[in-house]
Regions:
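Enriched for extracellular/lumenal, surface-exposed ectodomains of secreted and cell-surface proteins
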Residues: 106-121, 211-233
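Signal that preferentially marks extracellular ectodomain short beta-strand elements
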Residues: 85-103, 205
């Protein structure tokens, strides 16, 4: 059975020793959407009862701000006498207006597991997953010529996020972004500056050039936006 189920109106009628053990959506990784993307994804629900699992139904994929996605019916496969894994699919489309800006972030899976002996377990938050805005980060402004050791250089950049209403990319303001430096041959970059994006998503850091290498902007993401790194920009330091 499939359909749209709202936690606020779903009858809570669990009884017996049926349990929902695990829920995995999109292979356990966030669903990331750009300005006008659509995505198909799968989900699996593992349930257990001493008598075995007959079905998992009443699936609801929901978020705050009335976010709802429509799931398929599930298909269950017994992995032991007591436990079954039930799988299904769903999709989300920005052009079809299935998700809006205030729905980015945390989502939940509601499900009812039905046992062979008539027991069942219903959970509004049987599992959780994330639908994120796909960030974009561009580096600008590195010096194009050789600079002297110890010279101050400025590296600029732009952090953007999708606006799902207009289906365009816009600046992402008030976000902490790190500038990392990797000297030629380095095994691990080091953070040389952390700045906050301005109202238009613009970034600017001034550092002293110590050796030749590359500078990269790194955004750690948030609960509603994906992490992202810019392409590295090279800087050559003379003797």
């Amino acid at each position: 059975m499939c359909g749209i189920v709202l936690p606020s109106i779903q009858q809570q009628s669990s009884h017996g020793d049926t349990r929902i053990l695990k829920v995995v959506v999109n292979g356990g990784v966030p669903i990331e959407l750009g300005a006008s993307d659509s995505a198909n994804f799968s989900f699996s629900i593992t349930a257990e009862d001493p008598s075995g699992i007959r079905s998992v139904d009443q699936i609801g994929l929901w978020s705050n701000n009335y976010g709802i996605l429509v799931p398929s019916a599930t298909s269950c496969q017994a992995v032991s006498r007591t436990t079954s894994v039930c799988t299904g699919t769903s999709s989300v489309s920005i052009p079809k207006h299935q998700i809006f800006d205030d729905m980015a972030g945390h989502w939940f899976v509601q499900a009812t597991a039905n046992a062979n002996d008539g027991d069942k377990r219903t959970e509004d938050e049987a599992g959780k997953f994330s639908v994120l805005k796909m960030s974009r980060l561009t580096v600008f402004g590195g010096p194009t010529q050789t600079v002297a050791r110890g010279q101050s250089i400025s590296i600029s950049g732009l952090l953007e996020k999708p606006d799902w209403r207009t289906q365009t990319m816009v600046g992402n303001p008030s976000q902490n972004v790190s500038l990392q430096f990797c000297a030629n041959g380095c095994a691990k970059p080091v953070t040389v500056a952390t700045v906050r994006s301005d109202s238009g998503g613009n970034l600017l850091a001034t550092v002293r050039a110590s050796s030749s290498g590359t500078y990269t902007w790194v955004y750690p993401g948030s609960f509603w936006a994906s992490s992202v790194s810019s392409f590295p920009t090279p800087v050559t330091v003379g003797s």
